Amino acid sequence: MTPQDFYRTLEKDGFLLSSKQKEQFDTYFKLLVEWNTKINLTAITEKNEVYLKHFYDSIAPILQGFLANEPIKLLDIGAGAGFPSLPMKILFPNLEVTIIDSLNKRISFLTLLAQELGLENVHFFHGRAEDFGQDKAFRGQFDVVTARAVARMQVLSELTIPFLKIGGKLIALKAQAADQELEEAKNALCLLFGKVIKNHSYQLPNGDSRFITIVEKKKETPNKYPRKAGLPNKKPL
């Protein structure tokens, strides 16, 4: 998917990018490739692949109608090189984006990237989701939490749901069907008062299958969740 293909595909979906937005995506690509030689951000560095498998894939929840261009408080867990939240932010500038990542070098990259792209209302924090999930400044504060290829739903639910307001939504982007994952996550979702409201499949323009699972938070998360760092992964609910 060349940049021009990317623009045309978005235009067909009703999103006409401004010259500023096109420049932002171009700068994003260049900085991603440059920084990838210093720290491991991605295995995908070929331009057409980045536009398809990172940029287009990241904004899929918007293209599929699951997010609006409003001042929604959005948290991205384990965003790595900023996916999916920063491409979303470029497309929908009104989003207020917070990223938590456990690697400080990635936070350094994201901070510089946001400055170079001229993004406002973006915040970056270094640390573990389990620790921030028990911090009152973060817990129960977000309308949406996004996670792209972070963990199985059984683990992911404990890392994300505590951050949501009641009625808030987890948007999980997956490369594989989540049916088996959701079956395994039933107990975790029950304990965390999360309900799967959508399990959506779609295709990238090259025909690759992708999946979006949306979980709504129904009640306050019990105080004991999330458990200490590492436990959700070692002993899933």
Swiss-Prot record:
Locations listed in the record: Cytoplasm
Signal peptide: none
Keyword RNA-binding: no
The protein's name: Ribosomal RNA small subunit methyltransferase G
EC number assigned by the record: 2.1.1.-
InterPro entries (alphabetical): rRNA_ssu_MeTfrase_G, SAM-dependent_MTases_sf
Role: Specifically methylates the N7 position of a guanine in 16S rRNA.
GO molecular function annotations of the record: rRNA (guanine-N7-)-methyltransferase activity
Gene assigned in the entry: rsmG
Keywords attached to this entry: Cytoplasm, Methyltransferase, rRNA processing, S-adenosyl-L-methionine, Transferase
Residues bound to S-adenosyl-L-methionine: G78, F83, A129, E130, R148
Gene Ontology cellular-component annotations: cytosol
Top enzyme class: transferase
Pfam families xref list: GidB (PF02527)
Family: Belongs to the methyltransferase superfamily. RNA methyltransferase RsmG family.
NCBIfam families: rsmG_gidB
Keyword Secreted attributed: no
Organism of provenance: Streptococcus pyogenes serotype M2 (strain MGAS10270)
